[in-house]
Amino acid sequence: MADLKAKFLNVYSVLKSELLQDPAFEFTDISRQWVERMTDYNVPGGKLNRGLSVIDSYKLLKGEELTEEEIFLASALGWCIEWLQAYFLVLDDIMDNSHTRRGQPCWYKVPKVGMIAANDGVLLRNHIFRILKNHFKDKPYYVDLLDLFNEVEFQTASGQMLDLISSEGENDLSKFSLSLHRRIVQYKTAYYSFYLSVACALLMSGENLEDHVDVKNILVQMGIYFQVQDDYLDCFVDPKILGKIGTDIEDFKCSWLVVKALELSNEEQKKILNENYGKADPEKVAKVKALYKELDLEGEFADYESKSYEKLITSIESHPSKAVQAVLKSFLGKIYKRQK
């Protein structure tokens, strides 16, 4: 795995140097340095799970060792997903007025960057299609790749819009529901974090995505389960372990926990939620967390987790292809009972 990650990071360097020599634009030294620094700061810094999953999935679908060329192409698609993630995060952080990301200041918070970050986000988005053109233009699935990235980007941006407009305006908990939570998560997270990697691997394997709607549905369910875990960890796990400070309560987010709490609360408890949810005051946040404990949301989550796992395993095992089953089980194995 360490060897694969090293190969994957090597491909990043190749793709980056191609982008910095792109003949469609006349770079100056200053503009080239800016793009290099911006890309290095935002693209390769995460866990790289989405990108590496393309290689894993393709290998399982092919059922044998990959050639160097195949590893390179699967890595290039993996990096396109990491570039997509970087583009969303750079812009998300501006919208959310965030301060840190992956343990360092958000890009727009870096001195002399500021609102230039908005254009940098757009540039990162454009890099994806330059990479696809450079390496996949002659492939029979090139148009399908373009369609796939465009559609997933549209779904993610629409999910982000839902998330933003649901926590905007007057703090009104009555607009939160399990179906709103599910819809936000499905579009904002599940398509690009779960479906996209496998869809890339399927296209590389010569498959038609229209024949794999069942795979998409399973991965979307997995993405929803992943986000519910995220909502739970945001509140119940030590930020030192998590690597970030959870602010869902302060930010009035439509999180699974608050939706569950509303479902289980009596009138008195609902009053506590209404008075304290979405406020930055640490005492109010503590009151919400105390109510979550009182309602045994830890137990509710454990119950949700085991039921989701059972359901997913059943769906996966009913799939006719053992190779596809292996891909889906590998994804589920990475996230089941995770602690961060």
Curated annotation (Swiss-Prot):
Gene3D superfamilies: Farnesyl Diphosphate Synthase (1.10.600.10). InterPro entries: FPS1-like, Isoprenoid_synthase_dom_sf, Polyprenyl_synt, Polyprenyl_synt_CS. Dimethylallyl diphosphate binds at R101, K188, T189, Q227, K244, K253. It is found in: Cytoplasm; Nucleus. GO terms for molecular function: (2E,6E)-farnesyl diphosphate synthase activity; dimethylallyltranstransferase activity; metal ion binding. Keywords: Cholesterol biosynthesis, Cholesterol metabolism, Cytoplasm, Isoprene biosynthesis, Lipid biosynthesis, Lipid metabolism, Magnesium, Metal-binding, Nucleus, Steroid biosynthesis, Steroid metabolism, Sterol biosynthesis, Sterol metabolism, Transferase. Mg(2+) 1 binds at D92, D96. Pathway: Isoprenoid biosynthesis; farnesyl diphosphate biosynthesis; farnesyl diphosphate from geranyl diphosphate and isopentenyl diphosphate: step 1/1; Sesquiterpene biosynthesis; Isoprenoid biosynthesis; geranyl diphosphate biosynthesis; geranyl diphosphate from dimethylallyl diphosphate and isopentenyl diphosphate: step 1/1. Isopentenyl diphosphate binds at K47, R50, Q85, R102. Binds 2 Mg(2+) ions per subunit. One of its GO terms (biological process) is farnesyl diphosphate biosynthetic process. One of its GO terms (cellular component) is cytoplasm. Its cofactor is Mg(2+). Mg(2+) 2 binds at D92, D96. CDD domains: Trans_IPPS_HT. Catalyzes the sequential condensation of isopentenyl pyrophosphate with the allylic pyrophosphates, dimethylallyl pyrophosphate, and then with the resultant geranylpyrophosphate to the ultimate product farnesyl pyrophosphate. This is Farnesyl pyrophosphate synthase 1. It comes from Cannabis sativa (Hemp). The gene is FPPS1.
